[in-house]
């Protein structure tokens, strides 16, 4: 059910990388996103008072940090789904958190963040003369481009949806004030909008991703552990972050 597993990653994090391996031991809140294999729910691992679930979400409090990371990074079909035992002894399987829902910025906002910085590496290739057309690079490059285009569409739709809600909310707020309509009706209508679409007007979002001209990122081996490859990816990410943060005066 996968070419590899993330069990070695879990062991490395548990034995060598993490000084604390339980969510409740941390001084800050940490949430790790996965996808429930045998359901359609998104899984949110964290320090919750109890595990609970809704129609679309499963809040998991019985996983260690290393187990949650191993589950979240199990990207099919390269990595097999990762099993975590519940307190009742039932093994629940999870895989990559991006499968069910891209970015999941609502998790930070739902837990009190007023600035959410979301970083992702997906950037479809844009034609450049020095590289040429992707058809010259064979099936792997074409498949990668197709996958990136699908994911980018989901991300752009998510960002556009957030922007549309913000614009509608601000337009209604401004109209009521401009027309000097009753304050209690304005507040009530805005409260209904916030509740129905889970909108938080005091939360700002910053999205960091490679720029279209960063074709090196597209061709980089994201699964490589080679130090030079990793250093190159980190440098591209750092430059992308600086470029985006400067646009937001951060």
Name each region found by the language model.
Residues 1-250:
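Patatin-like phospholipase
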């Amino acid at each position: 059910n996968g070419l590899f597993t993330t069990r070695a990653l879990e062991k490395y994090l548990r034995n060598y990388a993490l000084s604390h391996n339980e969510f409740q031991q941390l001084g800050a809140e940490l949430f790790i996103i996965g996808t429930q294999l045998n359901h359609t729910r998104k899984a949110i691992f964290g320090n919750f008072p109890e595990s609970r679930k809704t129609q679309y979400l499963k809040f998991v409090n019985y996983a260690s940090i290393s187990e949650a990371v191993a589950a979240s990074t199990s990207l099919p079909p390269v990595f097999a789904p990762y099993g975590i035992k519940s307190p009742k002894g039932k093994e629940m399987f999870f895989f990559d958190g991006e499968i069910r829902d891209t970015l999941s910025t609502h998790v930070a906002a739902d837990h009190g963040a007023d600035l959410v910085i979301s970083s992702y590496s997906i950037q479809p290739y844009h034609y450049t003369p020095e590289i040429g057309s992707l058809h010259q690079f064979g099936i792997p490059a074409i498949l990668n481009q197709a996958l990136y285009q699908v994911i980018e569409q989901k991300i752009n739709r998510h960002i556009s949806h957030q922007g549309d809600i913000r614009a509608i909310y601000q337009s209604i707020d401004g109209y009521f004030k401009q027309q000097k309509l009753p304050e209690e009706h304005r507040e009530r209508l805005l409260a209904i909008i916030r509740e129905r679409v889970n909108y938080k007007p005091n939360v700002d979002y910053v999205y960091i991703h490679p720029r279209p001209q960063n074709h090196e990122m597209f061709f980089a081996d994201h699964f490589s552990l080679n130090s030079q490859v990793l250093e190159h990816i980190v440098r591209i990410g750092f430059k992308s972050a600086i470029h985006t943060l400067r646009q937001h005066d951060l």
